[in-house]
A protein has these predicted regions:
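Conserved Class I S-adenosyl-L-methionine
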Residues: 185-274
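Conserved beta-strand/loop positions that form the S-adenosyl-L-methionine
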Residues: 46
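A short beta-strand submotif of the Rossmann-like class I SAM-dependent methyltransferase core
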Residues: 109-112, 121
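Conserved catalytic/acceptor-binding region of the Class I
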Residues: 129-211
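Conserved class I S-adenosyl-L-methionine
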Residues: 1-38
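A short acidic, Gly/Pro-enriched loop at the edge of an enzyme's catalytic core
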Residues: 101-109
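A short, conserved alpha-helix within the catalytic core of class I
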Residues: 118-128
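Class I SAM-dependent methyltransferase SAM/SAH-binding core
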Residues: 42, 50-98
Length: 274
């Protein structure tokens, strides 16, 4: 496997599914309609983590492949898939730069759910182009609030992200960390990458997010522990001190322990192989 920092998401796998806001419940139907998915062909989910997308989309294909370099993330994906009786997923431990050898095509759809930025983007996109069937698609899936109407609050207060981030900085410093290094700030859009490849200019579809998503305090804390920049191992022996301060803050902001989370709509950036 190409070089990978195994501490990048160390300790995060158990928090990921519980702590990350879900994509639109209409995502599967939207992809099926846009791409004519009918249960045939194969799916490649790159940087799949614990299989959030892999598991949701597997029923739309004959076979799904979840690819990720983190063994704990893949183990979590296997566990959940087994619990749900999903048997058509193959899990591959590799980075996207190991494609195509790590998981040879062809594929009808390749997805990256908020994960392409961890890769050598242009190189990986060009590789994926060759792995797709003719007419196959690459879908980059993200939450977005940009230009999207905000729904009315369902009642509970918003998650106090600014205050929690201040606590993260108190414990970890002002430099945003990631594994053994620092997190790189992304300054470009996916469209900027795709237009330089054989895919050309992509198009975006927007699928309605969950307007009344309410999360409890432990889910909010797990959301931070699921991030590379705030993974449990970064806090060392002070991890419980950090967790305690976050819980105190959340209890002060919402005695009921409930918070409104609006991650936005689900944006799918689609590019099709000609």
């Amino acid at each position: 496997m190409t070089s990978y920092d195994p501490t990048l998401f160390e300790g995060a796998a158990a928090h990921y599914r519980y702590g990350r806001p879900p994509y639109s419940p209409q995502l599967e139907a939207a992809l099926a309609e846009e791409l004519g998915l009918d249960g045939s062909g194969r799916l490649l989910d790159g940087g799949c983590g614990p299989g959030i997308l892999t598991i949701r989309l597997a029923h739309l294909f004959e076979e799904a492949v979840g690819l990720d370099p983190d063994a704990a993330m893949l183990a979590e994906g296997r566990r959940v898939a087994a619990e749900r009786g999903i048997s058509n997923i193959r899990w591959v431990q590799a980075v996207a730069e190991d494609l195509p050898e790590a998981a040879p095509g062809p594929y009808r759809l390749a997805t990256f759910g908020q994960s392409l930025h961890w890769t050598d983007e242009e190189r990986v996109v060009e590789t994926v182009y060759d792995m797709l069937e003719r007419g196959g698609a690459l879908a980059l899936i993200v939450h977005t609030v940009e230009g999207r109407p905000e729904p009315p609050s369902p009642g509970p207060p918003r998650i106090p992200h600014a205050e929690i981030k201040a606590l993260v900085e108190k414990y970890l410093g002002s430099t945003r960390r990631a594994g053994q290094g620092v997190s790189q700030v992304r300054t470009h859009r996916f469209e900027d990458v795709l237009v330089r490849t054989r895919f050309g200019a992509p198009r975006s579809i927007f699928v309605p997010g969950i307007p009344d998503l309410v999360r409890d305090s432990e889910s909010v804390l797990s959301g931070y522990f699921s991030m590379s920049s705030s993974a449990p191992h970064l806090y060392g022996e002070r991890v419980e001190d950090f967790a305690g301060e976050v819980r105190e803050l959340l209890a002060a902001r919402s005695p009921e322990g409930l918070f409104w989370d609006w991650p936005g709509d689900t944006e799918v950036v689609l590019a099709v192989r000609s």
